[in-house]
Amino acid sequence: MPSYLRNLVWATLAAGLVSAAPTPSRVSDLTKKSSSTCTFSSAASASASKSSCSTIVLSNIEVPAGKTLDLTDLKDGTKVIFEGTTTFGYKEWSGPLIKISGSDITVEAADGAVINADGSRWWDGEGTNGGKTKPKFFYAHSLDDSTISGLNIKNTPVQAFSIQSDNLIIDGVTIDNSDGDENGGHNTDGFDISESTGVTIRNAVVKNQDDCIAINSGQNIYFTGGTCSGGHGLSIGSVGGRDDNTVKNVTITDSTVTDSANGVRIKTVYDATGSVSDVTFSDITVSGITDYGIVIEQDYENGSPTGTPTSGVPITDLTVKGITGSVESDAVEVYILCGDDACSDWTWSGVDITSGQTSSKCENVPSGASC
């Protein structure tokens, strides 16, 4: 081949290679899409691009008023990391402020990270009973085979965690709503669990103005190493009046409850149906309790006791052991109010609650228990 033809062929091939190469902006786009770790500084971008990332870093997110930090339907195995301070704009609405769902998801916090809901903007002493409409904080619904660990949460407007999941572990989470003690915090439950199987909560610190944990339905639930203060104590219920009204195989153990209305509590709904079975409260220390050290009652209606128990939600195979400590002088140490034949197969041992009063209004106390 003549030399001028060889030069022409090589020039043509080189031009084709240059034209086939991506432009610099295209290379950048490809790099972003192939990256497994995505760092977001806005809620909208995190929600829009969540499916492209195996690790999502939420860096100093400011969630707009009336919007949810929506990380639902994450791809399996995604890790979510809260970094810096996460904040939320103010609006009267029902929320939630955060919702996360998926399978095999890990949710955790970087060192020093805080999720600050600044609930004082909504607090008015009414909670969910009236006044301002307040957003729920965190929906862990369909967050299955997953883990939430190390979150540091401040001042939720009302309830913190709503849990409807299977095989979920929550470890080392702090919910600090103590500012609400003097500023109108109300109904600031720590963990509300319903329609769930296999939930484990370990080493939680909850400072609030309602239940530390409330199990309304579900099975195979384990709460251990909890530190609860300021609220309504460790609760089963209220059970009854919902789509699912069964609580089964629950253990609440190795925890402390201080400066709260109740120590441990089971409450079922008046004239409702359902069941509570295989529940264990063990090795719990109480102090500074203002209402009841232990309270088990089957008379709730519209969120308040009626004084008249019914038998539609039996409480069976209950173990209460190693519940110790003190209540205030005008509080009741133990109160049991059961419907006819509605409480049976109870084991009661090592209960030593002092400094309060003995109730004369207990009814149908089952064999083995004392009131």
UniProtKB/Swiss-Prot annotation:
For this UniProt entry, the molecular function terms from Gene Ontology, in alphabetical order, are: polygalacturonase activity
Q: What is its EC number?
A: 3.2.1.15
PROSITE patterns associated with the record: POLYGALACTURONASE
| Reactions this protein catalyses | (1,4-alpha-D-galacturonosyl)n+m + H2O = (1,4-alpha-D-galacturonosyl)n + (1,4-alpha-D-galacturonosyl)m
InterPro entries reported for this sequence? Glyco_hydro_28, Glycosyl_hydrlase_28, PbH1, Pectin_lyas_fold, Pectin_lyase_fold/virulence
Q: Where is the signal peptide?
A: 1-19
The record places the active site at 210, 232
Which residues are propeptide? Answer: 20-34
- List the glycosylation sites: 249
Cystine connections: 38-53, 212-228, 338-343, 362-371
- Which Gene Ontology cellular component terms are annotated? extracellular region
Q: Where in the cell is it found?
A: Secreted
Alphabetized Gene3D superfamilies for the sequence: Single-stranded right-handed beta-helix, Pectin lyase-like
Q: Which UniProt keywords apply?
A: Cell wall biogenesis/degradation, Disulfide bond, Glycoprotein, Glycosidase, Hydrolase, Repeat, Secreted, Signal
Q: SMART domains, alphabetically? A: PbH1
GO terms for biological process, alphabetical: cell wall organization; pectin catabolic process
EC class of the enzyme, as a word: hydrolase
Q: Which regions does the record annotate with the repeat PbH1?
A: 95-117, 165-195, 196-217, 218-238, 247-268, 276-298, 310-355
Q: Which family does the UniProt entry place this protein in?
A: Belongs to the glycosyl hydrolase 28 family.
- Protein name per its UniProtKB record: Polygalacturonase
